[in-house]
């Protein structure tokens, strides 16, 4: 299994106000700020990584909070719904908690799984699904391990047509189609038990989305190490798709390619991980800069928006 895609690695989205984004995910949803750094291409913008206690792949939701970018529109060619696994029996807790924060939600069932759906402050669509999941959580004073988010359950891609993307997911990334109901498809990989589901909604009449606050930027799939990463680069190239060279993102190595439906896919390694520059006990507590920006730390710190 080590040379396979190991489900989701991380998901990256766009926000507007940095403090509002940080407060919502750490204080309302109770996930850990695993890393506080900056955008590699725009060091005046934060890059927040939220996850579980260990910052494990499959739990990491990251954000570029571009202040003043305005609201985006979810639509075709995007990952439109991010599904989190929550402990069995915890949905009532979350319904009450979200209600206390004046967050409206909808209850539904997809492929036999009960879930709640709601939006974050920028409009990003989140779903909480009750499921058996043994991953360790990050707990807070008011969210204990019986209720805390476990990490990703699934990601939903919205597309004009399903077949070209299904081919990439099955032929290149090793997923298999498990269920289909009308225009909704569910794919899984048996290489891992968690964060291993990709759903597709296909609708030829769905307008294309507009990338800005409240929308997904890219979806990253997980591999063990650099050797496996480069094997997948060859697979993507052999399928006739363009893909980047290997990129060092400090906490993982990455490749990027755009699948035929328009979604930006990344493949990212487990190594070296988030403890490469700070200990587990203090993850996310200090501003960490890519080495090319360290000599500009004072200017960057003055430029970044206030979040304390």
Language-model regions: role of each:
Residues 64-68, 138-141, 201-206:
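Short amphipathic beta-strand starts and helix->beta connectors
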Residues 35-38, 50-83:
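Conserved donor-binding loop and adjoining core beta-sheet/short helix segment
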């Amino acid at each position: 299994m080590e040379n396979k895609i190991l489900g989701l690695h991380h998901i990256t989205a766009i926000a507007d106000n940095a403090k509002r984004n940080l407060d919502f995910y750490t204080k309302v949803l109770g996930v850990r700020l695993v890393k506080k750094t900056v955008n590699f291409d725009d060091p005046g913008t934060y890059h927040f990584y939220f996850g579980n206690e260990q910052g494990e792949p499959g739990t990491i939701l990251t954000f570029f909070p571009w202040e003043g970018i305005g609201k985006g529109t979810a639509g075709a060619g995007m990952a439109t719904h991010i599904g989190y696994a929550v402990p069995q029996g915890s949905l009532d807790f979350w319904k009450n908690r979200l209600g206390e924060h004046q967050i409206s939600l909808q209850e539904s069932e997809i492929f036999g799984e009960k879930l709640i759906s709601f939006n974050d402050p920028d409009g990003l669509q989140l779903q909480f699904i009750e499921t058996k999941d043994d991953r360790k959580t990050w707990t807070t004073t008011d969210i204990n391990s019986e209720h805390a988010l476990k990490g990703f359950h699934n990601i939903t891609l919205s597309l004009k047509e399903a077949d070209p993307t299904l081919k990439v997911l099955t032929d290149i990334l090793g997923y298999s189609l498990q269920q289909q109901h009308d225009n909704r498809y569910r794919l899984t990989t048996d290489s891992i038990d968690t964060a291993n589901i990709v759903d597709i909604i296909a609708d030829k009449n769905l307008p294309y989305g507009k990338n800005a606050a409240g929308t997904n930027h890219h979806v990253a799939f997980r591999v063990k190490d650099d050797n496996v990463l480069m094997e997948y680069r060859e697979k993507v190239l052999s399928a006739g798709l363009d893909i980047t060279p290997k990129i060092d993102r400090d906490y993982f190595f990455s490749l990027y390619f755009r699948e035929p439906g328009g979604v930006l896919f990344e493949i990212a390694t487990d190594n070296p991980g988030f403890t490469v520059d700070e200990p587990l006990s203090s993850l996310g507590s200090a501003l960490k800069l890519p080495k090319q920006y360290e000599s500009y730390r004072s200017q960057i710190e003055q430029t970044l928006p206030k979040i304390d």
